Curated annotation (Swiss-Prot):
GO cellular component entries: plasma membrane
Major localization listed first in the record, in broad terms: membrane
Keywords: Cell membrane, Membrane, Transmembrane, Transmembrane helix
Residues that span the membrane, as ranges: 21-40
Entry protein name: Uncharacterized membrane protein YdzJ
Organism: Bacillus subtilis (strain 168)
Membrane topology: Single-pass membrane protein
Subcellular location: Cell membrane
Length: 52
């Protein structure tokens, strides 16, 4: 009975850890993509200035 409960808790913890890792990597990707977006915007505006 106790071991069964412990297994359930372990499964919950493992799922929570996976979710946590996914959230952390998602946030890191967001922080990384923000400067990339700015760089692409800057390159786009530079290209427009060069074309006109």
């Amino acid at each position: 009975m106790i071991s069964n409960q412990q297994q359930k808790d372990l499964k919950k913890r493992a799922a929570f850890k996976k979710l946590n890792v996914a959230m952390n990597s998602y946030v890191e990707l967001l922080f990384l993509s923000v400067p990339l977006i700015h760089i692409f915007k800057w390159l786009g505006s530079l290209a427009l200035h060069l074309i006109h």
